[in-house]
Amino acid sequence: MLFNSFEFLLFLPCVFLIYWYACRGRQSRNLWIVLCSYFFYGWWDWRFTGLLALTSLCSYASGIWEERYPRLARHILWSNILLNLGILGAFKYFNFFADSLQDLSTALGFGALHASVVHVILPVGISFYTFQALSYSIDVYRKKLPATHDLIEFFAYLSFFPQLVAGPIERATNLLPQFQQDRTFSYADAVDGMRQILWGFFKKIVIADQCAVGVNAIFSDYAQASGVDLLMGGLLFTFQIYGDFSGYSDIAIGTGRLFGIRLMQNFRYPYFSRNIRDFWQRWHISLMTWFQIGRAHV
């Protein structure tokens, strides 16, 4: 289910109204978030939800075991890291190696392999929730937060639909405690959330999608394009990719605000950066932060 789809425009108000007016208390709201998030994710392909649940269960158990068996905590952490990265790598690169195997099989005279053998669908957003799962395991290991024993709470943290498929990639120390607290409706938060959602839609539909028309027209026949056309196409592409990424992030942040959840800022005017280093501190901030912290402490 895409943010800029008719289905999402029906889905969001229904989830919002039931969340605030039918659910009572933290537990029921967390459960409602989990159910709606899995419905949202399963809209692409219901099989994706099984992988998300597996990742959630493994990381949930990892956190508890790290606390329960401190002498084995580092081994437990690395087992969870290798398992999650192994799953991510298998889905990310299976088709690449399968295509190579297909070519080798044909070259050796064995014929082409069946399509179902060599192609696997890449689950939407698998990188985002994998990194977020690892964030939790790392933070528990570093004693930045205690392991949660509430399964629904943890599932809500890892599957929260506004940022499930396109980020921001949240640190467990920021997002998980918000699901551990009671939340009350705030009119100011709702208004601010809607403002950010509309701004995100503007970036996506008015800027990114319109720039994409020009980019596709120029690069679909780049051999015949002039130097000026190619330069213009490159310029339009920079606005397209920014509008896509930051637009989706704004919609996610605004949607989170509707439910009393504050997500981190993900883009901070990257094209006004002074240098490359400054650019990467402003572009997809949550991803860059995750890599910096993960590299420093694992």
Language-model region placement:
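Membrane-embedded transmembrane alpha-helical bundles that form the catalytic cores
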Residues: 1-295
